[in-house]
Amino acid sequence: NTSLPDSQKKYASNGFGYVGAPNYAAGYALAEEAVKRAKLQAGDSVFVWGLKGQGGDRGQRTVGVLDAFTKAGAKVIYQEIDAATNADPNAGTATFVGVMGANPGIKIVVTDHGGLTSNVGVYAQAAGLKAGQVYFAGFDMSPNTAQAVKDGFQNLVIDQQPFLQGYLPILNICLTKKYGFSGLDINTAGAFVDKANVDAVAPLAAVEIR
């Protein structure tokens, strides 16, 4: 679900589209919403654990997060997700504990990675944090993420609605083949999940509809 804007522009009339989350916009929106909900003040510290170093469109989601926090006047502590943690989120536990221990005033943590987002309960408890002590925001619903929301560790998640990401591209191909339609361009990341609506979303996340 990473866009290819140059190819899309060139081949849109032939059915080339994009169904997913515009990465920069999704990152910016998540951080902006976290700023409001956590009542962040200028000068407060935030920890962004991201993939800026990947570059390209994927790296833009982290850039969006960083830009929103910078605009809010936050003190940003950034940590690139290393290869080991990217492959196995549990491998990042020591990194998280180290960052939080060195920066005890962190108010918001953003994990720009679905696997890390699903693991925030493990990270928080390893760092000695109680539920709600730090505001966690991240990307992608999963059963573990839903449980972390229910437990009070995960506060805010952008839901990318993976059913739409799988269904609509196939529909796009069929419509292009049958009717010559141009490519669809659809943002599937329009919803936030939190404790107020997680009970409705969790069963759908378990079967990868949400």
PLM regions and their residue ranges:
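Structural recognition of the beta-strand scaffold that forms the well-ordered cores
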Residues: N1, G17-Y18, S45-G50, I77-Q79, ...
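Flexible loop/hinge segments that line or gate small-molecule binding clefts
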Residues: N1-A25, S142-K150, Q154-N155
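Solvent-exposed loop/turn segments at secondary-structure junctions
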Residues: S3-D6, Y24, L40, K52-G56, ...
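Hydrophobic alpha-helical segments within soluble ligand-binding/sensing domains
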Residues: Y18-S45, G92-T93, M141-T145, Q160-K178
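Short, solvent-exposed amphipathic alpha-helices that sit
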Residues: A26-E33, G56-V76, A91, T95, ...
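Short beta-strand elements in bilobed, periplasmic/extracellular small-molecule ligand-binding domains
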Residues: S45-V48, L66-P89, A189
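Hinge/cleft segment of the Venus flytrap/periplasmic-binding protein
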Residues: W49, D57, A72, Q161-R210
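Hydrophobic alpha-helical
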Residues: V65, A83-A148
